[in-house]
Amino acid sequence: MSDRISIIGGGSWGTAIAYLLAINGKKVLMYVRDNNQKDSINKKRVNNKYFPDHQLPEGIEATTDIKEVVSFSNIVFLAVPTHATRAVMKKINHLLNEEQILVSTAKGIEEVNFLRNSQIIKEYCNNKIAVLSGPTHAEEVIDGLPTAVVVASRDKEVAESIQDIMMSSTFRVYTNPDVVGVEMGGAVKNIIAVAAGIADGLGYGDNTMAALITRGLHEMSRLGVHFGGKLLTFAGLAGMGDLVVTCTSNHSRNRRFGIKVGKGMNTEEALSSVNQVVEGVRTTRAVYDWYQGKKLNFELPITSQIYQVLFNDKNPLDAVNELMLRGPKHEIEEVVDDVNW
C-alpha cells in the first residue's frame, strides 16, 4: 500500500480525490496548470477555482511541474477529461516507470478513434491500469456524504490496491474485472443524462424520466456488451448507479446542459452557460458517428435523436415525438426468445 499518491488534474474531481486520500492519511501531490491555483492550495489550503469554501487537509500539495508529480509516487490518478487524456499521456509516457499504476477517472469516449480512456493510455505505456467510476459528484464526496464506487482492472491486485487506499467510512469501493463495461457505462450514461435534462427543460414529468432512464440503460448495456462488457456490470454502480445520479442530480453538468437545451438554447449557448466540461456532448457525437452505417442487432434511438438535437438543430419536441411513435417493439428480445413466445 502506497502512502504517497500523485494526481494529474486540479479540477473538482481531482480535488475531491485528493481530499479523500489525504483524510485517509496519504500524502498527495496534485498537478495543476495555473500558478494562482497552486499558490492557493499550498498557501491558503483552498482550491480557489473549484472549492473556495472548503479547507483542504495539510497532506495535499500542488505543483505545476508534471515531472515532479509523476515521480512522486507509484500510483498516478489521471483526473482529466477524456479529450485531454492523449495530450497528458504524450507528456508523461517517458516519465513513467514500469511499477507505476495509472488510475483513469474520466467518463467519456475519444471522438476520432472511438477509444475508451484505458485504450488511449495503453497506446503510450505498458503500465497496469485501473478505472474508477460510479455515481460520484465531487461536491458530495468532499462534503463527506456516503458514496459508493467501483474500481475496475484486469489485475485483481491492482483493483484491490486502489480499493485499499480509498476506502473510508464515507467512501465505499467495490472491485470489478470488467474494464470495458465499467468504462462504457460511465461514458454512455452521459448521453442519457443530456436527454434527461432536455426532458426536464421541456417540462416533462416523472413518467418520462423513468422511461428515459430505463430505456437509456437498455442502450448503454447493448452497446457495452457489443464491445465485450458484461451485462451485469450495467446493473451496478458504473451502470444504473451512475445513470440515476447523473440523470436526476442538480450537480450533473450533463443534466444542467440538457435543461438549457430543452428551454431553447442551442448547443454552443448551453455549453457556454454551463462553463464546465460536458462529456455527454462529445460522447454523443462519438457514439453516433461510430453507429452510422453499421448493421447491428440493436438500435440506439435515444442517442440518435440527441445527436440530431445537438448537432443538426432538431427541435427537441420533434425528437420526443419520433421516439414515441417508433414502430412497436418487444421490451426485451431475450425474454421473448427464452419463452418461445
Curated annotation (Swiss-Prot):
It is found in: Cytoplasm. The keyword Transferase does not apply. The active site is at 189 (proton acceptor). Gene3D superfamilies: N-(1-d-carboxylethyl)-l-norvaline Dehydrogenase, domain 2, NAD(P)-binding Rossmann-like Domain. SUPFAM superfamilies: 6-phosphogluconate dehydrogenase C-terminal domain-like, NAD(P)-binding Rossmann-fold domains. It holds the Pfam family NAD_Gly3P_dh_N. One of its GO terms (cellular component) is cytosol. Its EC number is 1.1.1.94. Keywords: Cytoplasm, Lipid biosynthesis, Lipid metabolism, NAD, NADP, Nucleotide-binding, Oxidoreductase, Phospholipid biosynthesis, Phospholipid metabolism. GO terms for molecular function: glycerol-3-phosphate dehydrogenase [NAD(P)+] activity; NAD binding. It is an enzyme of class 1 (oxidoreductase). It catalyses: sn-glycerol 3-phosphate + NAD(+) = dihydroxyacetone phosphate + NADH + H(+); sn-glycerol 3-phosphate + NADP(+) = dihydroxyacetone phosphate + NADPH + H(+). Sn-glycerol 3-phosphate binds at residues 107, 134, 136, 189, 242, 252-254. NADPH binds at residues 12-13, 33, 107, 138, 253, 277, 279. GO terms for biological process: carbohydrate metabolic process; glycerol-3-phosphate biosynthetic process; glycerol-3-phosphate catabolic process; glycerophospholipid metabolic process; phospholipid biosynthetic process. Pathway: Membrane lipid metabolism; glycerophospholipid metabolism. NCBIfam families: PRK00094.1-2, PRK00094.1-3, PRK00094.1-4. Catalyzes the reduction of the glycolytic intermediate dihydroxyacetone phosphate (DHAP) to sn-glycerol 3-phosphate (G3P), the key precursor for phospholipid synthesis. Belongs to the NAD-dependent glycerol-3-phosphate dehydrogenase family. This is Glycerol-3-phosphate dehydrogenase [NAD(P)+]. The gene is gpsA.
